[in-house]
């Protein structure tokens, strides 16, 4: 019997010996998901999905329910932590060429879309001022779809404006989608272990493998402990750090906030949407800002999998990270110069990464053959 079979029969999953800390974010995401479902369940017990009572029920949870403030703040901070981890997880995948495992990458992109939908529905539930107006603006984008747009929007709203039926169905969707995420995550993990995890070098991991437990399981536990400690620090000292002050006012359809914006983790997509003056064009760009990730496995041209030994592509990668942060920052600002120009330039750079990368792959291939 081979060593791998011995390890598997001993319930010890064989994993590459050189996988770094960047490989811990999958287990951190699973921890976030468990935390969100647990806190979400306790919040759902006390929440009322009614436009007249939703805002009051959230206040009731934080003030009157024993430990309700912990549940409510942990759920809000947990959502932010979920997105921090998933963005790092995606960046790691892009950097180390893990997208070449197509099934895992495409299932992961589908998971990201599901997660964004869940977070959006959840943001509407407190029925604060920013919740209401963000929901109005984002759902209104459906009207940009030719022919079907208006009918789709009315169907989603359950009426001719955002009202009680909208809140009820958003609550139902916010409750059911995490279970879809669990099943999709299971598929994602099964597909991953079909081939096994890759490593920072991009080489065949079968050459040198060690048991997952205790070597990598303790590393996972360390990162999970750091993440939970960080969340508890925010919860204890600055629970409103990630929240919008506007959302502490009850939703009022008659008063529009000076600057409508979603939660920080959607700001990069919202910034791309806002940078295009055309409604349909902006909606397409918003969708493509996520969907373009699906093109990565099909446009890889380099002989080398990882970016570790590709300085040109590395430069483009760090430009992408800087661009992502800049778009997020500009989306927090009002729609006026110079923020309009900055968001337009950064949006072009964001999409150009996925076009220039294959070209740089060819250039690097030529350079490597010349050196040989």
From Swiss-Prot:
SUPFAM superfamilies tied to this protein: a domain/subunit of cytochrome bc1 complex (Ubiquinol-cytochrome c reductase), Transmembrane di-heme cytochromes
Keyword Membrane (UniProt): yes
Residue numbers binding a ubiquinone: 193
Requisite cofactors: heme b
Main location: mitochondrion
Transmembrane residue ranges: 25-45, 69-90, 105-125, 170-190, 218-238, 280-300, 312-332, 339-358
CDD domains: cytochrome_b_C (cd00290), Cytochrome_b_N (cd00284)
GO CC annotation terms, alphabetical: mitochondrial inner membrane; respiratory chain complex III
Single biological process term from Gene Ontology: mitochondrial electron transport, ubiquinol to cytochrome c
A Gene Ontology molecular function term of the record: ubiquinol-cytochrome-c reductase activity
Binding residue positions for heme b b566: 89, 188
Subcellular location: Mitochondrion inner membrane
Binding-site residues, heme b b562: 75, 174
Keywords assigned: Electron transport, Heme, Iron, Membrane, Metal-binding, Mitochondrion, Mitochondrion inner membrane, Respiratory chain, Transmembrane, Transmembrane helix, Transport, Ubiquinone
Keyword Zinc (UniProt): no
Membrane topology: Multi-pass membrane protein
Pfam family, one: Cytochrom_B_C
Cofactor binding note of this UniProt entry: Binds 2 heme b groups non-covalently.
Miscellaneous comment as given in the Swiss-Prot or TrEMBL entry: Heme 1 (or BL or b562) is low-potential and absorbs at about 562 nm, and heme 2 (or BH or b566) is high-potential and absorbs at about 566 nm.
Family: Belongs to the cytochrome b family.
Role: Component of the ubiquinol-cytochrome c reductase complex (complex III or cytochrome b-c1 complex) that is part of the mitochondrial respiratory chain. The b-c1 complex mediates electron transfer from ubiquinol to cytochrome c. Contributes to the generation of a proton gradient across the mitochondrial membrane that is then used for ATP synthesis.
Subunit structure: The cytochrome bc1 complex contains 3 respiratory subunits (MT-CYB, CYC1 and UQCRFS1), 2 core proteins (UQCRC1 and UQCRC2) and probably 6 low-molecular weight proteins.
Designated name of the protein: Cytochrome b
Organism of derivation: Dendroaspis polylepis polylepis
Taxon lineage: Eukaryota, Metazoa, Chordata, Craniata, Vertebrata
